[in-house]
């Protein structure tokens, strides 16, 4: 065995998933009842409304803008959130030789113009500190682009910057437009993105100044926070804003499937990674409900599925099934979940070195659509009404025209693939016509997956434009084939981590 060449882990996992996704023997079907006349509740597409991205200046790149259009057009993205609109590379703030502030919104305009031209609004994260406004010029975060995370040296100058920033946006875009944006104060101040001491008290001071100035410019501007990591500080933040009468229009916080249980929940419970994000969302939803401002919307402004370290889960089709489960479990507890990120034009750790490195995004470097892109695309097809259903592996929805759209999945954690197996569901329908044909689309090892074609061409570190086009062609989802119901039932086999979307006409 030692004489055989070693496979990269992403290749090994892909092969293992493919093997366990094969149907060697037909498993017994598990019955799922689907009643087309069941009670319904609204299903706003909270999982696709907003995405994160690489920092502000990257939005000027051609590749970023192409990817933004793809995600907007195929997935329904309406807002994007990114760091560092105030970073020195954007050129917003300077001081003259007398220490007077000098503002320049040229790049800000190009950044926001580029988003709006593509049908996407900014979810404005107000960060980071311009160096000449920083109380501590050495408070540099270790990200590749070296942002300053210090509090301001002078709150009068910070207030003036916030006032000028807000006034400029309103003058350029109009209050009817800017009032549809959101302004989030800072990013993860409870960890190393904020150098204030003590962290919470100094962040609250920053928030108070920022929120009051924005509202003074125009009360229609929407501002919120605390934008914390691992779902921290929400009760304290809402108690503070209520006690000090500080404006707040929404709550934002973060939580990843990779966050530890102890950090996110303060306990030593055994909570699987697949359950952590929605459990954290439910926790914060309850904290808001118990606060002095219980009606505030909740925006989960960073999250992602488990990375499984070197298994590179975010590069394979695991994401589609994991996302479906999160939609199933998080529905009703959150207003928007901002998947981090929509593409891999992203430089927190430096310049991307190869397309499939486990990056956060739906689109790999160069514009290669990853399986996660196709997973989101399929789930975009769900209707806007959810039908009551007790199954843990189905989401049953209805579109405005009456068509049923059902998501079904077989989620197996990547560190348990060897124990996973295909499963067969028999969907038994009531309230639909006998003998109708349904359409089935899916993502799995063979559908919506560029990795086999990438390996076949030698896994190029720098694929050419022709190779990228070939990869995107190879991974395109095929036209679904109609399948006729038998006695108002449908059997569908789901290999490991397959996501299937079933479209059922009711007229």
What are these regions, as identified by a protein language model?
Residues 57-58, 86-92, 131, 186-193, ...:
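Conserved radical SAM core fold
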Residues 162, 179-181, 185-187, 221, ...:
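Aromatic- and acid-rich polysaccharide-binding/catalytic face
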Residues 247-264, 274-278, 317-347, 366-382:
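Glycan-recognition surfaces
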Residues 1-12:
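Bacterial N-terminal signal peptides that target proteins for export
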Residues 227-252, 303-322, 326-327, 331, ...:
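Substrate-binding cleft/loops of secretory-pathway carbohydrate-active enzymes
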Residues 16, 23-182, 197-230, 244-246, ...:
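Non-catalytic accessory regions flanking glycosidase/transglycosidase catalytic cores in CAZymes
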Residues 165, 278-287:
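Short, well-ordered amphipathic alpha-helical segments that serve as non-catalytic structural scaffolds
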Residues 258-268, 285-321, 344, 349-363:
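Active-site clefts of carbohydrate-active enzymes
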């Amino acid at each position: 065995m030692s004489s055989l060449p070693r496979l990269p882990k992403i290749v090994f996992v892909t092969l293992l998933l493919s093997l366990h996704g094969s149907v060697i023997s037909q498993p017994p079907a598990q019955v799922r009842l689907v009643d087309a006349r069941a009670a319904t509740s609204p299903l706003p597409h909270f999982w696709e409304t907003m995405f994160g991205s690489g920092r502000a200046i990257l939005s000027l790149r051609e590749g970023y803008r192409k990817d933004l259009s793809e995600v907007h057009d195929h997935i329904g993205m309406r807002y994007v959130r990114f760091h560092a609109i105030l970073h020195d590379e954007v050129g917003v703030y300077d001081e003259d030789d007398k220490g007077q502030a000098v503002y320049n919104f040229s790049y800000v305009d190009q950044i926001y113009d580029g988003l709006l031209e593509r049908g996407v609004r900014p979810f404005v994260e107000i960060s980071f500190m311009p160096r000449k406004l920083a109380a501590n010029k050495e408070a540099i975060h270790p990200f590749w682009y070296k942002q300053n995370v210090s509090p301001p040296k002078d709150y009068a100058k910070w207030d003036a910057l916030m006032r000028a920033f807000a006034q400029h946006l309103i003058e350029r875009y109009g209050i009817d437009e800017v009032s549809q944006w959101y302004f989030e104060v800072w990013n993860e101040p409870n960890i190393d993105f904020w150098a204030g001491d003590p962290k919470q008290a100094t962040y609250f001071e920053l928030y108070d100044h920022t929120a009051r100035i924005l509202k003074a410019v125009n009360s229609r501007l929407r501002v919120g926070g605390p934008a914390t990591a691992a779902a921290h500080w929400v009760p304290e933040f809402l108690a503070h804003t209520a006690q000090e009468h500080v404006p707040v229009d929404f709550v934002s916080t973060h939580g990843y499937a990779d966050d530890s249980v102890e950090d996110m929940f303060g306990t030593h419970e055994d909570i699987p990674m697949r359950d952590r994000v929605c459990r954290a969302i439910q926790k914060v939803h309850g904290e808001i409900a118990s606060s002095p401002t219980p009606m505030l919307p909740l925006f989960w402004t960073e999250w992602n599925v488990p990375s499984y370290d070197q298994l590179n889960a975010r590069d394979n089709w695991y994401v589609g099934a994991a996302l479906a489960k999160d939609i199933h479990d998080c529905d009703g507890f959150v207003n928007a979940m901002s998947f981090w990120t929509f593409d891999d034009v992203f430089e927190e750790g430096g310049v991307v070195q190869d397309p499939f490195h486990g990056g956060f995004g739906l689109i790999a470097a160069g514009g290669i659509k990853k399986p996660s892109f196709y997973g989101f695309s399929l789930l975009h097809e769900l209707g806007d009404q959810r039908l009551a259903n007790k199954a843990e592996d189905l989401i049953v929805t209805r579109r405005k025209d009456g068509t049923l759209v059902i998501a079904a999945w077989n989620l197996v954690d990547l560190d348990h693939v060897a124990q996973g197996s295909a499963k067969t569901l028999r969907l038994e329908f009531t309230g639909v016509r006998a003998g109708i044909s349904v359409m089935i689309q899916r993502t799995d090892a063979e559908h919506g997956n560029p990795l086999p074609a990438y390996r076949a061409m030698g896994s190029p570190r720098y694929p050419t434009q022709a190779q990228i086009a070939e990869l995107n062609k190879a991974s395109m989802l095929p036209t679904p084939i109609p399948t006729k119901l038998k006695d108002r039932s449908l059997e569908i086999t789901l290999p490991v981590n397959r996501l299937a979307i079933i479209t059922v006409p009711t007229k």
